[in-house]
Amino acid sequence: MKTSIRKFLISTTLAPCFASTAFTVEVIMPSENFDGSSGKIFPYTTLSDPRGTLCIFSGDLYIANLDNAISRTSSSCFSNRAGALQILGKGGVFSFLNIRSSADGAAISSVITQNPELCPLSFSGFSQMIFDNCESLTSDTSASNVIPHASAIYATTPMLFTNNDSILFQYNRSAGFGAAIRGTSITIENTKKSLLFNGNGSISNGGALTGSAAINLINNSAPVIFSTNATGIYGGAIYLTGGSMLTSGNLSGVLFVNNSSRSGGAIYANGNVTFSNNSDLTFQNNTASPQNSLPAPTPPPTPPAVTPLLGYGGAIFCTPPATPPPTGVSLTISGENSVTFLENIASEQGGALYGKKISIDSNKSTIFLGNTAGKGGAIAIPESGELSLSANQGDILFNKNLSITSGTPTRNSIHFGKDAKFATLGATQGYTLYFYDPITSDDLSAASAAATVVVNPKASADGAYSGTIVFSGETLTATEAATPANATSTLNQKLELEGGTLALRNGATLNVHNFTQDEKSVVIMDAGTTLATTNGANNTDGAITLNKLVINLDSLDGTKAAVVNVQSTNGALTISGTLGLVKNSQDCCDNHGMFNKDLQQVPILELKATSNTVTTTDFSLGTNGYQQSPYGYQGTWEFTIDTTTHTVTGNWKKTGYLPHPERLAPLIPNSLWANVIDLRAVSQASAADGEDVPGKQLSITGITNFFHANHTGDARSYRHMGGGYLINTYTRITPDAALSLGFGQLFTKSKDYLVGHGHSNVYFATVYSNITKSLFGSSRFFSGGTSRVTYSRSNEKVKTSYTKLPKGRCSWSNNCWLGELEGNLPITLSSRILNLKQIIPFVKAEVAYATHGGIQENTPEGRIFGHGHLLNVAVPVGVRFGKNSHNRPDFYTIIVAYAPDVYRHNPDCDTTLPINGATWTSIGNNLTRSTLLVQASSHTSVNDVLEIFGHCGCDIRRTSRQYTLDIGSKLRF
């Protein structure tokens, strides 16, 4: 059955819908553009067929500028009163713009009173669905009651959006719940390109979506974005009155940004909320505050029966409803590639999250950064609630979250209400849970016992936890560090550390009701940190038992010690095992003020108990666990304990200093190798000009040079590369002798593959002579020879980018000479097959010398480098092949040679660290002492005056490679 929508006006309400109807009414939707501002009349349509209706689009349908808000019979543009309603887009556009109504669902509504769950409303197959500036206002009854109406789309039936390309709900407004969509069950899935709820607002609850049974945002490949939505009371973007909300499998991420309400800045839920297996989940700049409000309607809506809880959950509020009696309602975030809560704000509690039961686990990365609240800068757990944090697939980090109650803000990650607790606190091997902001807790109820929390449990559904839990003041500014509250965490819970590591760093304090430690776990403390029991009225017997305590040597400053303090009146402190020592960094002993001298009575550990019950019977102070640092100050420790004060101190005996690899500076001596390598490249480019020719010539050559030395046991990898130009002149001064003069410039850079980078500007000059008659009278042993001297002066600059120290910079100049003397025996050929002109066996003596003077860096940790030089003598032996092309006078040359280094003084220099007087030798790379040389050049005459040429070469050693490429042109006179 088919009919046109323009004639399909049904207003009567039919019998209740039936699930097993024989046929569905099929309606063909026209391709139209209805614009009320042009006077075109829109046929408001009501569907009431209990068999259900299938609307099939034949094209795009645009509906704009309609207003029936003042009508006593105000209605939706499309209304359904019976049967299921399916709207099939067929790739078309479905658009509503500037629609105003005083009915529920300004654009579309489906209100079924009997068995609504059997009559779903569905939208599928649209290229675009647009609901822009649709407004649902209030209406009054004959009894003068004001009824607030809701949403652009309203349904008492399940609602489904599936397989659409783009969905946009923008700038919609309503007096009732949900400005964009309100329904019992809302499912949006398989959206392909865009899913955006932007700028929607409700005077009451649910700025974009309101659901009473379920909200599902699942399996969308499009980004899911809720932006700048707002409400007058709850749920800036989403309001869930019961049931559950599932956001899962969204491939391009989920983003809630700039949403606002009085509670639940982005989401307010009285049902379960689950985020799972999305690519990215981000909540940014959402706010929950009593000051957040849209203008109230006139007259205002009836006040709620329960006083609103305002200013809670900057991003998400998730608790059971006040009535009926609370049931298990939880917020779960798991399986995400990344989770980010950034700069969300709540005026009261939970800058990011506020919930009775919250679980965050199995995410690859979780970050709470810069969130703010009165209590619980990132997370707040109300009375008797619970929180589970598991870093089992990635790290969890809390940093720069703030609590602002009055006066100066303080750092605060989590706040536990009265009797609230951790249900799970753990990290698996290789992952860490970082608390750079402390945890705060309300006091226990008078009759309540402290809950027991197993930290890093041995066995769980996720396997054994053996990762690290860190409490640290590392990211505090100097001003923040001066306030103890910024680094003091309080947990009114009994902690049992079963596995992994609990680390207290950078001045952090952890107060717990009771603390015990399993033998397979480790407690690491910095000097200046404290592990203590709480000292409130509800904790009279809290105790601390440690069996594997480790002190971080990085943190020692000679004044502060790690402190273990049992503050409860009857509690005992028991410590056993061997005191461990750890270095968090390989250069921990580079503390000049601390370790550059022998030390006595260095504070290490203080053990305290209000009851004076401190047991150290099985506590050992042996130094077997101390491993000498491979770098920095070398020495030995000796520890003692005062049995009266229970204070552990240490004596340090300095034995020497070993520089960290970052200080070794191989680039300084290697700069001499760079000079020699550059001059060899210049020599090859000059020889490639083709010097055994009559007449005079002037050539200009572009030079490129690349060198890499491999990492060896004695030296790290080294790379040098550069480019420049050579201007060369040539003249034959006698029939048997020629002279060549050249000069040029190179621009180079080098690096040592760790922290050193160098740049240089090289100026050079070269002199060449060639003799083509016998060097020994009538002897034909050498019938020709060449000689060349090349000099360079380079201006060097090196920057050392230390990992922890300020960058070091220095500059200086190097001088380098390269002398070459060659004897050869040309053999003239006339080969028609290879067209070879000649073969020239040769032997050459090459002497290279480079030197630099003293050098000093310009930082407090700067080094002083002494004089250094390089001397290398090589004797290349090889053969040169010359070939004429069939289009003479073009010719080609190939050189193959073996070049052993018969003598070498490898470059090095004495290095001093003035800040402590330590000295060592900086050593350059020791290249393999033999090399294979292969070069090729080509010359092409453009005319009798102009010639162009190219040259390439490689120098292959077992531990290094050098490559050159030169292109030039020559003028003959």
From Swiss-Prot:
Residues 284-303 are annotated as: Disordered. The keyword Signal applies. It is found in: Secreted, Cell wall; Cell outer membrane. Pfam families: Chlam_PMP (PF02415), ChlamPMP_M (PF07548). Coiled coil: none annotated. Residues 284-293 have a biased composition (Polar residues). Residues 1-24 form the signal peptide. PROSITE patterns: AUTOTRANSPORTER. It is a peripheral membrane protein. It comes from the Bacteria. InterPro entries: Autotransporte_beta, Autotransporte_beta_dom_sf, Polymorphic_membr_middle, POMP_repeat. GO terms for cellular component: cell outer membrane; extracellular region. Keywords: Cell outer membrane, Cell wall, Membrane, Secreted, Signal, Transmembrane, Transmembrane beta strand. Residues 691-973 form the Autotransporter domain. SUPFAM superfamilies: Autotransporter. NCBIfam families: POMP_repeat (TIGR01376). Belongs to the PMP outer membrane protein family. This is Probable outer membrane protein pmp13.
